[in-house]
Structures are given as C-alpha cells and as structure tokens.
Amino acid sequence: MIRQCLSRRAACPCYRIAAGGTELTGCLYPQSSRISRRGRDWSSTSRRAIDTQTSGASNGADYVPLRKQLKEQAREGRAATRKGEVSPPEHEDWELTVGIEIHAQLDTDTKLFSRASAAIDDVPNSNVALFDIALPGSQPLFQPATLIPALRAAIALNCDVQRVSRFDRKHYFYQDQPAGYQITQYYEPYAKNGSIWLGPHDGIAKEDGVGVKIGIKQIQLEQDTAKSQELPSSTYLLDFNRVSRPLIEIITLPQIHSPATAAACVRKIQTILQSVGAVTTGMEMGGLRADVNVSVRKRSEGVGDHQYHGITGLGQRTEIKNLSSFKAVENAIIAERDRQIAVLRAGGAIEGETRGWTLGSTETRKLRGKEGEVDYRYMPDPDLGPVIIGIDVFFELKAKLPVLPDALLQSLVQDPKYGLSTDDAKALIELDDGDRLDYYKDAVDILITLQKDLSDDFSGGGKVVGNWVLHELGGLLTKSNLHWDSERVPAQSLAEIINLLSRNKITGSTAKSLLAMVFDGDKRSISQIVEDENLLLQSLSREEYIALAEEVMRQNPKMVMEICEKRQLGKIGWLVGQIKQIGDRNRVEAQKAEEILRELILK
C-alpha cells in the first residue's frame, strides 16, 4: 500500500511508503516470472512500436534481434577461446578500467512527476502534463507508485535501500529538457552499495577466471528527457511523451578491466531487471542504454593520479555516451582503449571529455568537454520533499521477488525435468523479456501430461523441448524476420508435435513440416492435420532401408571410403540426408537409416 504522509504541509512535501492508505490500482507484487507482462498487452505489434530512438542511439533500422546477438556473441566467444587471448599482446603492460552508468526505463503506468501516462507507443506529444514542458507555475507531483519497480531493482541488485532519499536538480541546457534541468538523486539516492556476480556463463573475459564481483555505487531515480530527431538545417523534432518517464540510473564502481566483461555486466543487469519486472523492455528495444567511463594506465609506471567513485590510482577517464547494444558497449570500449594507449605512447595526455561512438565504427569521436559536479550546478530540488520508504514495504517486496536469473539458470540446467545446456538455459532466460522461458515451461508441462502413459521417465524431454523452442521455432522466426509471439504456435501444439515424434508416430521431417504449417497460420489441431494429410509414419522394412542405403553408397563411393578408411564418422549424417532425398521423407527414420549405414560401411 502507498499513501502520502499525513504530516505533509506545503513547506514540507514529504511522501511515505507504508502500510495502510490508498490501495494502488493493479498488482504491486510479482506472483510469477510473468511479472514483466502484468496488465499490458505485449503483442508483437505493440513491441514493434516501442520507442527505440534515443539521442545518439541507433534508430530502428539498426535493430538486431537478441537471438541473433546471442548467436554472434557465442561465436565470438568461441573464437576468442581458440585464440587463447583476450586483448592484443601489445596491450599487456596496460590496465584498462571501466565504470558503467545504465539508464533503464521503469515499468510504470504514470510518469515520475505527473499523472500523465508513461505509455511507450502513443501518438507523439499526446501524453504531456504542464510540468513536463515546464510551463510557468507548474510543479512536480511525485508519483509514489513509481518506487515499486525501482525497489524491486535495488533489492535484486543487492543494494542497501535508504529509508530517506531526496531529489536534486542537474542543470544543463538542451532542447530535450525544457526546464533547463533534470531532476535526479545525485546526493541522496534511494539505493547504495549493491553488487552483482559475473561467472563464465555470463560471457566474462578469460582473464577474469571463475568469476568477478562488480560493485554498484548507487541507484538513483531520475526523469527521462524528450525524444529528439534531427532534421536537415539544424531543425529538431521533439516528442515530449518521454519527458519525466521514470528512469533508474545504475552506477557501477570502476572495477571492470576488459571490454567483454563490461558487455557481460550490462547484459546481466538487464536480465536481472527484466526478471523482476522492473523495466519496460531491454536494450535491444530501446528501454535501456549505457554510458561507459574508460581509462588506461601503464602498469610498469605504477598507479595513476586520478580517482573515480572512491577508487584511486586510475588514469584520466573519458565517458562514451548512449550505447544502445551489448556489442556497442564492447566495441566502443575497445576503440577508446586503443585510442588512449596510442595517445599516451605518443607522449600525449588524455583529456577528460565526453565522446561518442557510431555503430560499425572503429573509433570514438569527441562530443564535448567533460562536465563535472560544478558544471551541472547540482542543488536540492526545492519543490520536492524527501521520499521515505517504510521497512514493511521493503520486506514485502523482497519476499515476493521472483527467482533471480542465476538461481533460475541453475534450476534449468540441474533439474532433470529440464536438463538444458547452460547456453540454451541462458538464451531462454534472456530472450523476449522471459516470455520465451514461460512458453518453454508450459510446453514441458504439457508434454509430461501427454506422456504419462509411457513407462520410461521424462528424462531428456525438457532438453528436446528446449531445442525445438530455441532452434526450430526460433529458426522460423529468424527466417520470417518476426518478433516472438507465443500464440503463433501454441505451447499445446508444440508439445503434441514432440509427443508424436518421441513415440515414432511421425518422422523428424514430418514434425518440422507440422511446425511450419502451424507457424504459417494453419488453425487445425495437430491430430486433425496429421489425419487430413496422412502424415502418420508407415515404417520401411529392413530390406527397404538396406536397398536405399546401398543406392546412396553406390552414388557416393568417395564419401564411403573416407568414412571407412579415415573413420570420418560425422559424414554418415550426410548420407542419412541422401537417403531421405531418394526415399520417402515421411517414412525414413533417421536413427534406423544411420544404423543400417553403419552396419554396411563399418562391418
């Protein structure tokens, strides 16, 4: 429950989160891992309409689905492992230090300081309160409900939630901030002293070994700015719908020493925020963006002369703004690291400044000199009183928090019901705000019910379902360039297809054809499609398999010789594919075909 403090006076606009008071509309506490979709219609249409354009960030044309990012990251990780190095040998005497500032849009119904809607897909300038555009006489009206997702984020990131926090003004002049200042929590944020743990499964650099702990200095509430679009002749279009949407800024300590680990840190924080329903969407859809602070120092010359967030002995840092993907974080840090090392090797000095990075670039570029605390003229906001957080609400939220990603990953890998590989489990957790994982679990539960009559246990079934969800269904999505939609192929339909396949009622080829038919919009039940199209398996006899295998062997004598003499057994799978081509794909069972080929070739 949330209420205004009963002692509120005009001179002391104090707000309080405590038991009692006015009940908020909607669910305050997550009841399951589906929290990110509570009370909202996250259809594929609305997802595509999410605001992906930010100042200095990539626009919609640069959108890369997360599933493709994950595949690319996995390939690059394997390549780095094969090379046996993380950074070029010429950089071995240089220490890189990185701190990250993450800006995430909170999942709320209203803006931070007005009752205007925080909807992300409405007509431009349709959700604008007087305060949002700084009309004279308008004042901020703090919306206590915005604290709920912010508190979930702080608890999930192991922060010390402060009983009292206050708002400050950060002054700067730019067209996206009509008031001439941004309201934030510079001096007294609502959460401090957090941390996250990154392990090898998170994609950290090889040099970080079994894991690394990254400290979080603070998390602060702040208002977002307008969306700005630059046109020719220095003309700007402004959408004030985004002004005062509630953000949290998560500031890590400068304890990261490799580009890969920095990207892994951002990815891990995003996954945690999504898992507890704190944010609207992730970096891939514009709901999260990152700034990175980069410095280098030469190890052989001792400690540096600079400090940042209490960490001393650092080199002069620069800040790279508005990075809108995990790959951008990694590549921008690499580019800035190389630039700073080159400058220092040439006898130059690094200037503290704000820099930018463009998608596909190998260099950063100067935007402006780096502003400091004095430049921003931070001051307490006189129109807003302190925010007081009741301990009862803190413990209530903590008790209701969903399972966090690391514990969930462990369950998906170790529980025999699922038995997923680490890579597949991680992908399910990270894809589609957790919706893909919910779908997977539903399909597993349905398949277990369908196979109750089988004497064998369900061991391995969860892994099979994971493969179909990620690779077969995921492949259709990628090929069609479509966003995830759990209703396109209902979990019931997928489970029925896998059930028929596991009972040898249909072949693998038939199963894939069934999936494609449902994916393309066939509304018939799986059993009806199988009956109408006569898809039930009519098994080949042993003699028919032998005849097909001998025909394929006659057509591919060189392949047979390589398998027989060089023991290149992996090529048997290719011959199985040839049997399917010359035989009836809906009757050829890959396992039986392989058994016959092995018998004939390796006898």
Swiss-Prot record:
The keyword Cell inner membrane does not apply. It is found in: Mitochondrion. GO terms for cellular component: glutamyl-tRNA(Gln) amidotransferase complex; mitochondrion. One of its GO terms (molecular function) is ATP binding. Keywords: ATP-binding, Ligase, Mitochondrion, Nucleotide-binding, Protein biosynthesis. Its main location: mitochondrion. InterPro entries: Asn/Gln-tRNA_amidoTrfase_suB/E, Asn/Gln-tRNA_Trfase_suB/E_cat, Asn/Gln_amidotransferase, Asn/Gln_tRNA_amidoTrase-B-like, GatB, Gln-tRNA_amidoTrfase_suB_CS, Gln_synth/guanido_kin_cat_dom. The keyword Disulfide bond does not apply. It catalyses: L-glutamyl-tRNA(Gln) + L-glutamine + ATP + H2O = L-glutaminyl-tRNA(Gln) + L-glutamate + ADP + phosphate + H(+). Disulfide bonds: none annotated. HAMAP family: GatB. Allows the formation of correctly charged Gln-tRNA(Gln) through the transamidation of misacylated Glu-tRNA(Gln) in the mitochondria. The reaction takes place in the presence of glutamine and ATP through an activated gamma-phospho-Glu-tRNA(Gln). This is Glutamyl-tRNA(Gln) amidotransferase subunit B, mitochondrial. It comes from Paracoccidioides brasiliensis (strain Pb18).
